[in-house]
């Protein structure tokens, strides 16, 4: 069984494990010292001394077999499992006593490096290590040649993938918790020097107390509104994730998925997709696919077929307290979340932000350092990019001389590109990075930057944080999911309470952008999204063929951004749901909050300007123009 395999595996040096510690010391470290992940050399030395003393005492009351058995029940074996029994259930869905020799060796192979030799994520590396385990057992006489050959021929990795699919469909945590645990693990690695395996062990078995930033009421509201079909005006389709393992006549396995299905049918019809009007239609399509690919004598492996349905279009929302950077709520998808660590569309994918990026990639820089004001004018007329590609407004209309304020209100492409060209694309690129957009590539430093035409796009969370910077008077706060993490003794090991703000924009610039985006709500593309009891500022965004729809905005309390679209980038005929979700969420979370106003900084100056030139109006000339060519602006 597993004890025999593991004993052989660690046989070098008798009872010595990697790192020079005995098995007894390793057991003491795992049980008494939470895995021994101290951050300072002094603490490590102290722990080593205590380990050695306790190991001597333990060996007086337990024999080697008992110590080894206890050790095997505490070691990290990947996939957040501690001990061979947990690993056996996780990888093979059965007790350790039921494992075959082949399965024993696969688990034994994990011990040296649980991440590298994970049989789910790195099956080839595990197979190579497993072969060494079996060869060592053969050389030492624990198994014979026939047993060795039989174990090597066992294709157990398909079985592992089947069990993994079943496990993933039976456990679920919220999108917020997924993002929270990701942040804790990353910070343990980056700040404390842990390996990823050590960080996961600390997270799940180290007795940590994590103080999250989540507001449970806001989280519930976000989940309800993202999943409220009324917000989508009955535009509901279903896609699916599909896994099929077929046992062929010769005993080999063949794996299929929704991707192989898509490839199969698109070879016949390039426009074929896997979006259907009901789950029943999904099932019918799958049955048709199976009838075409399965041959006589093929059978579906036990537990070898899983289907997960996904509502389309999808949506995500992030809500941040701009004053602190605290993420108070986050939803990464629409529909039932059937497993932990599923695709989080708020944090783990990038999509094009569309016109929401006009503020981030152009106007923040233009007003802050480009020498322009909301009254600055460009001629909204047919033109082209520098490479000769024609440039159009979304409605193919042109309005002549137009101020920046009006360009923001009406989301005008031509005027925005002309303004970015005037200040230099490099300045817009620099400000976008300073506003927290980490996904930019050097190639994004071009005229399409201001329209959201990016190499990779942005995450919903980072877009929210960039708008939160404007809402916070120009000061950027890194978005965080926890305030503090404490160890089992109550000591603070990770601390976000000192989440230091960084000034990115002058407070006057932030206020000007806010003022213009308030007009977006009252008279522009964001009409209908205003709140009944709170001032709001926001910007809309859609991309080519409406593949993405985005709505980002804020109040004096909170900033939120909603993304919506099909997972496979299908064109959309209805895009208003991003604005509807944003409005519904923000209206509900502000219902009982005292009204606050956006505070105007002392440096703001107003003046009468000419709407055609953007220059100061000339008394006796502009005010005498019967067309009304003068307005008061900032």
Predicted regions span which residues?
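Short, well-structured active-site flanking segments
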Residues: 1, 82-84, 144-149, 357, ...
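Peptidoglycan glycan-strand catalytic modules in the bacterial/periplasmic cell-wall system
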Residues: 1-149, 164, 197-199, 334-336, ...
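Active/ligand-binding-proximal structured segments within catalytic/core domains
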Residues: 1-9, 340-364
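Conserved catalytic neighborhood of penicillin-recognizing serine enzymes
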Residues: 11-35, 164-169, 371-428, 488-519
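Active-site SXXK
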Residues: 137, 222, 324-325, 351-378, ...
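Non-catalytic structural connector segments
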Residues: 145-272
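A penicillin-recognizing enzyme superfamily signal
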Residues: 212-232, 238, 242, 246, ...
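Mid-domain, small-residue-enriched loop/turn segments at the edges of structured enzyme/sensor domains
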Residues: 389-393, 424-465
């Amino acid at each position: 069984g597993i004890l025999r395999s593991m004993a052989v595996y660690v046989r070098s040096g008798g009872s010595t494990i990697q790192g020079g510690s005995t098995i007894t010391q390793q057991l003491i470290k795992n049980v008494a010292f939470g895995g021994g992940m101290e951050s300072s050399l002094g603490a490590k030395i102290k722990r080593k001394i205590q380990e050695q003393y306790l190991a001597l005492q333990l060996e007086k009351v337990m024999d080697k077999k008992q110590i080894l058995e206890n050790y095997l029940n505490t070691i990290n074996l990947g996939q957040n499992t501690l001990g061979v029994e947990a690993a056996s259930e996780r990888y093979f869905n059965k007790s350790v006593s039921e494992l075959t020799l082949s399965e024993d060796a696969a688990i034994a192979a994990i011990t040296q490096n649980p991440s590298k030799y994970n049989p789910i994520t790195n099956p080839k590396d595990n197979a190579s290590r497993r072969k060494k385990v079996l060869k060592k057992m053969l050389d030492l006489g624990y198994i014979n040649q026939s047993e060795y050959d039989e174990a090597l021929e066992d294709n157990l990795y398909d079985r592992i993938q089947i069990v993994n699919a079943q496990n993933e469909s039976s456990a679920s945590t919220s999108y917020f918790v997924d993002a929270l645990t990701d942040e804790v693990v990353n910070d343990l690695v980056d700040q404390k020097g842990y390996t990823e395996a050590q960080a996961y062990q600390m997270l799940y078995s180290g007795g940590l107390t994590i103080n999250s930033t989540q507001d449970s009421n806001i989280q519930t509201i976000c989940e309800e509104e993202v999943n409220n079909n009324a917000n989508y005006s009955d535009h509901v389709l279903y896609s699916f994730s599909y896994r099929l393992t077929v046992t062929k006549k010769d005993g080999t396995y063949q794996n299929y998925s929704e991707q192989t299905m898509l490839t199969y049918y698109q070879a016949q019809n390039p426009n074929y997709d896997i979006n259907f009007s009901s789950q029943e239609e999904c099932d019918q399509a799958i049955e048709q696919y199976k009838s075409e690919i399965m041959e006589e004598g093929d059978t579906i492996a036990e537990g070898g077929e899983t289907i997960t349905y996904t509502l389309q279009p999808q949506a995500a929302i992030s809500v941040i307290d701009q004053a602190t950077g605290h993420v108070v709520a986050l939803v990464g998808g629409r529909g039932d979340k059937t497993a932990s660590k599923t695709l989080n569309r708020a944090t783990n994918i990038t999509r094009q932000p569309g016109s929401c990026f006009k503020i981030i990639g152009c106007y923040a820089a233009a007003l802050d350092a480009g020498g322009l004001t909301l009254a600055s004018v460009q001629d909204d007329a047919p033109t082209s990019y520098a490479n000769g590609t024609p440039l159009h407004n979304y409605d193919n209309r042109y309005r002549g001389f137009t101020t920046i304020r009006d360009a923001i209100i009406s989301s005008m492409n031509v005027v925005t590109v002309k303004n970015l060209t005037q200040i230099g694309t490099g300045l817009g690129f620099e400000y976008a990075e300073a506003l927290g957009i980490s996904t930019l590539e050097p190639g994004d430093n071009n005229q399409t930057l201001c329209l959201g035409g990016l190499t990779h796009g942005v995450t919903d969370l980072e877009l929210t944080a960039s708008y939160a910077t404007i809402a916070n008077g120009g000061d950027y706060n890194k978005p965080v999911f926890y305030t503090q993490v404490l160890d089992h003794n109550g000591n603070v090991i990770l601390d976000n309470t000192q989440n230091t703000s960084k000034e990115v924009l002058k407070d006057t610039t932030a206020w000007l952008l806010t003022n213009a985006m308030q007009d977006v709500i009252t008279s522009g593309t964001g009409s209908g999204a205003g709140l009944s009891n709170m001032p709001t500022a926001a910007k809309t965004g859609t991309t080519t063929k409406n593949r993405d729809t985005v709505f980002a905005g804020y109040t004096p309390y909170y900033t939120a951004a909603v993304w919506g679209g099909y997972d496979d980038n299908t064109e959309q005929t209805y895009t208003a749901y991003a604005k509807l979700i944003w409005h519904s969420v923000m209206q509900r979370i502000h219902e009982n909050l005292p009204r606050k106003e956006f505070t105007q900084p002392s440096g703001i100056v107003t003046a009468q300007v000419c709407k055609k030139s953007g220059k100061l109006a000339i008394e006796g000339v502009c005010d005498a123009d019967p067309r009304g060519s003068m307005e008061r602006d900032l």
